[in-house]
Amino acid sequence: MYGTSREAARCERWGTIPSRGRCCLKLMPMFSPHGPTLRELTVQALSSVERGYDLLAPKFDHTPFRTPDAVLDAVEGELKGMGSFAHGLDLCCGTGAGTDVLRTVCRESVTGVDFSAGMLSVARARVRSDGPPHVAWVRGDARALPFGPVFDLAVSFGAFGHFLPRELPGLFAEVHSVLRPGGRFVFPIGAPPSPASPWYWALLGFDTAMRVRNALWRPSFVMYYRTFRFGDVRRELTRAGFTVEHRALTDFGHRPDGSPRCRLIVATRT
């Protein structure tokens, strides 16, 4: 396990992931001076998901909502071990952090798709476009992907909280439809924090606040942290036509019960 026993205990207490000798606090409320202000976050939260991310896009990479480099690096290492891919899709690509990962494992093309024009604009500016592989950006809804079965690999990082549980069957069916036979859908999923962890109650409080907000305010802003559960994900992927395996991302260690703190889901289109 990475880090000292004291660090591991601290990470277990807070429900976080030890990484390279430090805790990987993806969702802790820590913002750089270049990040959004509280007022800007409030305006975003009272907007639709699409409009909210358009507003947040210029400062998104300076928030803790961006997938940590430690997670991106771990997934990249696993993908390289699976071999080389021709065409890759970054689902809900945001500012392109996952697209950078795909550029290292795909030979011919990489496509980032997102429904926020603002996030795509930032992605175009920050991700290298000189190929190979060729990099393309598409504005579109992950629930109605504008592609045929052309991809060998699809990845997604940190976006599933924007989909309600009832939307997962349709979402996974869409991904299945754009993969070639044998194509893989790969993404990390973290273990939930223990109820003894303050982080468990912080996430519960956040999700509860969002449910109240969505009951009282329109348009809704779907963003929940406790709805994407491992068992539900595995079941719905199987129903969508995938063969599902999961691997421990060993860089992040294990919980006291021996289960991995972070898993990599590898779903293969059959």
Residue map of PLM features:
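Core SAM-dependent methyltransferase catalytic element
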Residues: 255-270
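Conserved class I S-adenosyl-L-methionine
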Residues: 29-83, 101, 186-210
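A conserved beta-strand element that flanks and buttresses the S-adenosyl-L-methionine
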Residues: 155
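Class I SAM-dependent methyltransferase SAM/SAH-binding core
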Residues: 89, 95-144
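A short glycine-rich, Lys/Arg-flanked "PGG" loop and its adjoining helix->strand segment in the class I
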Residues: 169-181
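Conserved S-adenosyl-L-methionine
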Residues: 242-253
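Short alpha-helix
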Residues: 224-241
